[in-house]
A protein has these predicted regions:
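Conserved catalytic core of the tyrosine transesterase superfamily
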Residues: 1-392
Length: 392
C-alpha cells in the first residue's frame, strides 16, 4: 500500500474503530487524520513503510498548530490499525544494551519467575535497585562487604526511613540474585544495613459499616457506577488487592459454584466465595455495562475506547476518587477498603485466623497487626491497672 492510498482503507478503519467502541464522531475525526497523514507522507515522497515511531513524531509536531488531533497520542489508533495490516513497521522493542540494563533485565526476570512477584512489584524493585547497580557499574565480582554497606548507605541518603527500607530490600534481593548467579564470590545481601522505621506498622483502619454501605451507594450512582460498584465491592467485601481486581478474568468466575479464582502475590491462587452483594453488581456490569465485542478476557475494561483492561493504578485511582468525592478521608484508598473487610471480620466476632484467610495472607505473623485494631478483643484480655495498696 502506498502512502497516497491511505484514504482507500477508510472503510476498514471505521469498522475496526467501531469494534473497539469508538463513537461515530471519533471515527470521522480519525479517518480525516488517516487521510491527512497519507497526504503528508506523499508530499514528502515518503513510502508508507517509512512510518516509524520517529516519523510519526515528526508528523505530530507538524500538526501542533491545529485545533485537535495534534499529539502522538491521537495517532495511536491510526498506527495500531496500520501495524495490524502490516503496512507500517511494528513499534520498536527496546533491547537492553548497557551492562547495567542487561543485569536489571535478568534480575527482573528472576523476580518474576522465581519469586512470583507481580509486574508492578518487579518494576518497583528494578527502580529501587538501579542506583546501587549504577554505582557499582554492574561489576559485582569486585564487591566487598564494606563496599556494599557504603553504597547502600549512600543510596538511602535523604530518604525517609520507610522509603530507605524499601530500597534496602530491593538491593538485598539484587545481591541474592547476584550470588545465586555466581556474580559474587560470597553472599553479600546481609551487609546491606537496616534503616529505622516508625515503631511497628500502623494500626489498620477501615470504614464503619454505615460508611461502607454509603460508599457503595455513592459509587453505584456516580458516573461509571455499573463498572465501579462491583470493582469496589471486590475490595470492600472480599478484600481483594487493586492488582487482583484488575487481573480478574471472565474465566475466573464460576457462577454455578458461587466462587471466583483470585490470583494474588507470588503466584498464589485462591478460590473465594462470591456473595450475592458482590455477584449481583458484577452480573449487572457484565450484562449491561461491559463493552461488547471485545477480545479481552479481563473482567474490568476502561470506560472509554479502545476499552483496554484496567490496570492496578486505575483501580487505585477509582477507589481514591470515589472516597474523596464521597467525603470519606483516609490514606491508601484501595488498601483502606481491603482493611475494612478484615476489620469487619474481627468486629463480627471472627478471629485473626479467619481475617488472615479472607486477606489471603501467607502466615499468621502478617495478620497479627490486626490484633491492634480489634480493641474489644484486646480489652477482654487486658489486666486492670493496679491500684495503690492492691495486688500487683
Amino acid at each position: 500500500m502506498e502512502s497516497s492510498e491511505l484514504g482507500q482503507c477508510a472503510d476498514g478503519f471505521v469498522a475496526w474503530l467501531g469494534r473497539l467502541g469508538y463513537s461515530p464522531r471519533t471515527c470521522e475525526a480519525q479517518v480525516a487524520l488517516l487521510r491527512h497523514l497519507g497526504h503528508w507522507l506523499a508530499d514528502r515522497g515518503l513510502p508508507l513503510s517509512s512510518l516509524t515511531s520517529e516519523v510519526a513524531g515528526e508528523y505530530a509536531a507538524a500538526r501542533r498548530g491545529r485545533a485537535q488531533l495534534r499529539s502522538e497520542r491521537a495517532l495511536r489508533p491510526v498506527l495500531s490499525y496500520l501495524r495490524e495490516l502490516g503496512a507500517v513497521p511494528s513499534a520498536a522493542v527496546v533491547v537492553p544494551r548497557e551492562p547495567v540494563d542487561v543485569l536489571l533485565a535478568r534480575f527482573g526476570g528472576w523476580l518474576s519467575r522465581e519469586r512470583g512477584l507481580a509486574p508492578a512489584t518487579v518494576s518497583s524493585y528494578l527502580h529501587q535497585a538501579r542506583p546501587f547497580a549504577d554505582a557499582c557499574a554492574g561489576q559485582f565480582g569486585t564487591l566487598t562487604a564494606v563496599r556494599v554497606a557504603g553504597l547502600a548507605t549512600e543510596g538511602a541518603a535523604g530518604l525517609r526511613p520507610r522509603s530507605a527500607q524499601v530500597r534496602a530490600n530491593a538491593v538485598r534481593a539484587l545481591l541474592r540474585f547476584a550470588w545465586l548467579e555466581g556474580m559474587t564470590a560470597v553472599p553479600l545481601a546481609e551487609f546491606v544495613g537496616s534503616f529505622a522505621a516508625p515503631a511497628g506498622p500502623a494500626i489498620p483502619k477501615g470504614l464503619s459499616p454505615a460508611q461502607a454501605a454509603e460508599f457503595l451507594v455513592f459509587v453505584r450512582s456516580a458516573p461509571g457506577g455499573l463498572r465501579n460498584e462491583p470493582m469496589m465491592a471486590l475490595l470492600l467485601r472480599l478484600a481483594l488487592r487493586a492488582g487482583e481486581a484488575a487481573g480478574l478474568l471472565l474465566d475466573d468466575i464460576a457462577w454455578r459454584q458461587g466462587v471466583i479464582t483470585v490470583r494474588g502475590k507470588r503466584n498464589r491462587v485462591d478460590q473465594v466465595p462470591l456473595p450475592a452483594d458482590v455477584g449481583g453488581p458484577l452480573a449487572r456490569y457484565l450484562r449491561d455495562g461491559r463493552p461488547a465485542g471485545t477480545a479481552h478476557r479481563q473482567v474490568f475494561l476502561a470506560l472509554d475506547a479502545p476499552h483496554a483492561p484496567v490496570t492496578h493504578a486505575a483501580v487505585t485511582s477509582v477507589a481514591g476518587r470515589a472516597l474523596r468525592d464521597a467525603g470519606i478521608s483516609g490514606n491508601g484508598a484501595a488498601h483502606l477498603l481491603r482493611h475494612t473487610a478484615a476489620c469487619g471480620v474481627l468486629a463480627g466476632g471472627g478471629g485473626l485466623a479467619e481475617a488472615g484467610e479472607l486477606l489471603r495472607h501467607d502466615g499468621p505473623q502478617v495478620t497479627a497487626v490486626y490484633a491492634r485494631s480489634d480493641l474489644a478483643a484486646l480489652r477482654s484480655i487486658a489486666r486492670p491497672w493496679p491500684e495503690e495498696g492492691g495486688p500487683r
